[in-house]
């Protein structure tokens, strides 16, 4: 067996590992279910591991000593391991170490009132959002879904936004208005809504004043969090996470909305 016959599966495994690493944000943009647990990327890493292992097995067949002639293949094998280790560390450890929220409004508590500019720069208060006169489907208004998010360029955030937009008609039909709060300026939120086709409300909190009052701040941005408020401003459901990737799915939000009376 030639050296090339040993090296090609190892290098193929390396490139597949690279694809598995860099494709994660694109994967969960296309398939949001992979955002919470990257099963598709882990499958690619598994296939890459099989290719690398097959190449190494061929190199170390008894009596062949082909390992002396596959220096580049060994280098690729080591790089593949490093890539997987970095992926696992980033997705399963670092991304899941956001500080726990201890003072966020609890279920049954009244949410803190606030006033923030929307994507058009107009001031909007929580009281106004809860008012039937400003809530779509006013005759059946049941509340507001506050979605705290990071920033416009965040792929995980946009994955959540797309889910909300996809189910927006259902939210509105049940009398609940989704509202995103982030550190983006009104101009940035307006550009995002225009380019992505989002038709729900964005509120801007670049100073993190409201984000910190709700205890969902992480450094200089908001961590993922959702609060479902009834028309009295009382929290009826919330979702807090210590991961920058894991968020409530729209189906979970809709299930919570259905519990509102």
Question: Where are the predicted features?
Answer:
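N-terminal "domain-start" segment that seeds a small globular fold
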Residues: 96-134
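Structural micro-motif
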Residues: 197-201, 216-227
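Structural microenvironment flanking redox-active thiols in thiol-disulfide oxidoreductases
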Residues: 158-196, 206-212
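Membrane-embedded alpha-helical segments of integral membrane proteins
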Residues: 6-58
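Short active-site neighborhood of thiol/selenol oxidoreductases, capturing the structured segment around
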Residues: 126-164
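Thiol-/selenol-based redox modules, centered on thioredoxin-like
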Residues: 20, 222-261
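Short hydrophobic alpha-helix segments
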Residues: 127, 214, 237-239
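Internal/C-terminal transmembrane anchor helices
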Residues: 65-93
């Amino acid at each position: 067996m030639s050296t090339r016959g040993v090296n090609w599966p190892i290098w193929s495994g390396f490139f597949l590992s690279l694809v598995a690493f860099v494709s994660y944000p694109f994967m969960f943009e296309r398939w949001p279910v992979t955002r919470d647990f990257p099963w598709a990327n882990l499958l690619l890493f598994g296939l890459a591991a099989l290719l690398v292992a097959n190449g190494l097995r061929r190199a170390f067949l008894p009596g062949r000593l082909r390992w002396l002639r596959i220096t580049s293949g060994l280098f690729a094998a080591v790089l593949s391991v490093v890539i997987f280790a970095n992926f696992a560390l980033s997705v399963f450890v670092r991304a899941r170490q956001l500080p726990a929220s201890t003072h966020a409004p609890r279920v049954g508590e009244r949410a803190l009132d606030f006033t923030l500019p929307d994507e058009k720069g107009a001031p909007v208060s929580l009281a106004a959002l809860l008012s039937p006169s400003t809530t779509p489907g006013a005759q059946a208004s049941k509340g507001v879904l506050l979605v705290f998010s990071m920033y416009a360029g965040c792929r995980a955030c946009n994955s959540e936004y797309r889910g909300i937009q996809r189910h927006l008609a259902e939210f509105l039909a049940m009398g609940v208005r989704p509202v995103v709060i982030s550190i983006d300026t009104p101009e940035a939120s307006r550009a995002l809504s225009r380019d992505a086709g989002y038709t729900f409300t964005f509120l801007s909190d670049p100073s993190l004043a409201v984000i910190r009052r709700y205890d969902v701040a992480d450094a200089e941005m908001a961590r993922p969090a959702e609060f479902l408020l009834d028309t009295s401003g009382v929290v009826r459901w919330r979702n807090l996470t210590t991961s920058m990737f894991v968020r409530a799915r729209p189906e979970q939000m809709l299930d919570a909305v259905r519990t509102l009376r």
